[in-house]
Amino acid sequence: MKILTAFFILFFSCSFAQRSAETQPPPQARLVKSVDHLTLEAALELAKNSTEKAAQLNKQVSLAVLDTAGNVILLMRGDGVGIHNTEAARRKAYTAVSTKTATLTLLRNARANPDTNNLNTLPELLLLSGGVPVWYRGNVIGSLGVAGGGSPENDDAIARAAAIPEKGILTSK
């Protein structure tokens, strides 16, 4: 009887240990994460959607698409657009990816709250309308910035028009 009891204890202990090992993630999963990245192909499609919206508004714009680290994937300037708008578009995109917030929303929130009014003093952040984070499956995978649309509302509308909803790439959460 003692042998039978010992056998059952050993058998169930081994099977429990084996199951728990199978359900635990590998140790490297705590050290490395897989993430989705915005591709050049997607950046070109985002830019195409934005420039089509700009054309509907009879505007030429500068446009920047960045990855989540703030690196430029695509930078373009429409015909006749002032050269300062290219840097403004990049900084708007940087602000959007850094804060995971559309720059128009960030601008309005900063103006409404004296505690955040000094956000515009941080290097690289530009609290002007026209920057949006780019979302995929609930995560920011990059950003897009637009400058030269003629008004804050135009820059924001042109940036938001970049979305590729049929592929799950969005400009709002």
Question: Where on the chain are the PLM-derived regions?
Answer:
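Flexible, solvent-exposed loop/hinge segments and secondary-structure transition points
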Residues: Q18-K173
